[in-house]
Amino acid sequence: MNSIFKKIKNYTIVSGVFFLGSAFIIPNTSNLSSTLYKELIAVLGLLILLTVKSFDYKKILIPKNFYWFLFVIFIIFIQLIVGEIYFFQDFFFSISFLVILFLSFLLGFNERLNGDDLIVKKIAWIFIIVVQISFLIAINQKIEIVQNFFLFSSSYNGRSTANLGQPNQFSTLILITLFLLCYLREKNSLNNMVFNILSFCLIFANVMTQSRSAWISVILISLLYLLKFQKKIELRRVIFFNIVFWTLVYCVPLLFNLIFFQKNSYSTFDRLTMGSSRFEIWPQLLKAVFHKPFIGYGWGQTGVAQLETINKSSTKGEWFTYSHNLFLDLMLWNGFFIGLIISILILCFLIELYSSIKNKSDLFLFFCVVAFFVHCLLEYPFAYTYFLIPVGFLCGYISTQNIKNSISYFNLSKRKLTLFLGCCWLGYVAFWVEVLDISKKNEIYARQFLFSNHVKFYNIENYILDGFSKQLDFQYLDYCELKDKYQLLDFKKVAYRYPNASIVYKYYSISAEMKMDQKSANQIIRAYSVIKNQKIIKPKLKFCSIEY
């Protein structure tokens, strides 16, 4: 009987890891968010692993620094209460991502304390399989042999993306997998020949992304490795790795441009010298930080910060939902002072983690985290659960090295964990129900709009996805019907969170008609003109007596 239960447990763990890995290769299909289904599948994998392991562990331990999570959650609650966070949906997402990060950390932390490396090895193997499949998809993007709904068949300006649809995300996945491969080799889980072949494939795939964040990661990781291990043989290994990597960085784009006449790859020199819009937006967003230095603009509302502070000299033709820098986002969301404190805590945690590492296997796992955080300084992989979960798990797994005595952690009763996991499962199911409701509402509105300018109001109770629901209403419904159903503040919130011509003009019209909040309405008209790179034109006011 015990053997049957053990098999069931092992199969369930495999299924959880499988869901986590499959999030990287399923296509982007949701109308609400291009990565929604991928992220939900990753969360499903985490919940399965936690549920199985909660019965397996004799005791569940939580580090004392968990209180910092509670501090951040408290800040988000305050922002919701005072109205800085516009929709419950944004509050829910922010809390959920922190809870997901904490649960991932908790799983890794207790997995290591219980002397088990089963999950980390299974994650390593599933990532290796996923990246090899993604490598084939990336090759197909270059040669375009197979066209299929399930394949992201076009590259990103000649840069490989696989089914992630974004080259830097694909690059970070490859780097994480490369160091998980090194971890397996260090644990003697594969031989030298297999290791060398897979390593070369991973490096080649990474070079195809032409990711500059990967270049920075390789330089930083090489230095961190040599700081830990300073023997001559280690120096030779680092030099050899860098020779292979940088040679491929230079040669692979030339090779593809030679083979394919359309020259669909940037040269390495082009990638090295070309600019980036993120460097143009950062100065403007830094000004926005000091515009609200104490409480910020609310978690997840970087776009609001940009719209509120934009002017004629700001970056044109760009609207950012994230600043492309984790620390800048934290300052925008929380204000300069609290954001700076959280940023320093993150850096201190990483430095302490690195200092506590005593062996190569842990160092390779730490390099997975480093690759992720370097990417966080140039983009926003922290906004995707399929990255957050494995990185949180690895942080928890490595951080057990910091435990010096029993004061460093406290026990969590299985009853409390079971209750909490039960709430997480209920929240997960409730979220899926609302996703289906919103998808239905979007389909109904879109179908009606095909045949008539007048769309009938579709009323559904949305307790979680209130922002998406209101966005659909303001996008499709007549101005007069919106006036009857919503307040001026609702017009403002939707316009600043989901700016498009229809929604912005409706907000401007009601503000002018009521002769209230006109400064904010004029600001978003100016801001919208800048992000669309158009001349500032005051829109025609909408009136109930006129159909449009």
Swiss-Prot record:
This enzyme's EC code(s): 2.4.-.-
Molecular function GO terms recorded: glycosyltransferase activity
Pfam families assigned to the protein according to its UniProt record, in alphabetical order: PglL_A, Wzy_C, Wzy_C_2
One Gene Ontology CC term in the entry: plasma membrane
GO BP term (any one): protein glycosylation
Keyword tags: Cell membrane, Glycosyltransferase, Membrane, Transferase, Transmembrane, Transmembrane helix
Null mutant phenotype: Loss of glycosylation of the ComP protein.
Presence of the UniProt keyword Membrane in the record: yes
Protein name (Swiss-Prot/TrEMBL): ComP-specific O-oligosaccharyltransferase
Organism of origin: Acinetobacter baylyi (strain ATCC 33305 / BD413 / ADP1)
The gene coding this protein: pglL2
